[in-house]
């Protein structure tokens, strides 16, 4: 997750999956009231990890590509790149919470044409950190 592409001043830590970094009891700070409300009400969108499912070959992702669901643009890609270890194109996008479910399928509008993608686990390699702790 990158600041200025995936995380910006228009997103919140809760939307980005970084709520564990927020200490609402630390005292007053700019945006605290909004975060308290969002934590209580829940988020309307979440930063999700998607992978292209049509190809395992490298595809250039620039950010800003339209994400379609059932023929309708629902959001745009924030960033993407190729995961050489998992041999997949990995994309980040803020999805409406009802679509932010593992396995939900989308069509990504690329310069080369449309490709299928789906929501996947946020951590694709060593999700339990077993290799890191070995």
Spans of model-derived segments:
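Conserved, structured C-terminal
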Residues: 1-134
């Amino acid at each position: 997750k990158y600041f200025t592409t995936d995380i910006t001043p228009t997103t919140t830590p809760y939307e980005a999956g970084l709520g564990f970094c927020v200490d609402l009891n630390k005292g007053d700070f700019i945006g605290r009231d909004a975060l308290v409300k969002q934590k209580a009400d829940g988020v309307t969108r979440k930063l999700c990890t998607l992978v292209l499912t049509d190809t395992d070959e490298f595809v250039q992702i620039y950010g800003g590509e339209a994400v379609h669901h059932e023929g309708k643009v629902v959001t745009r890609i924030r960033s993407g790149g190729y995961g050489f270890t998992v041999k997949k194109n990995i994309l980040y996008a803020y999805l409406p919470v009802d679509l932010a479910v593992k396995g939900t399928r989308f069509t990504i509008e690329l310069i080369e044409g449309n490709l299928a993608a789906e929501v996947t686990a946020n951590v694709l390699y060593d999700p339990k950190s077993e290799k890191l702790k070995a």
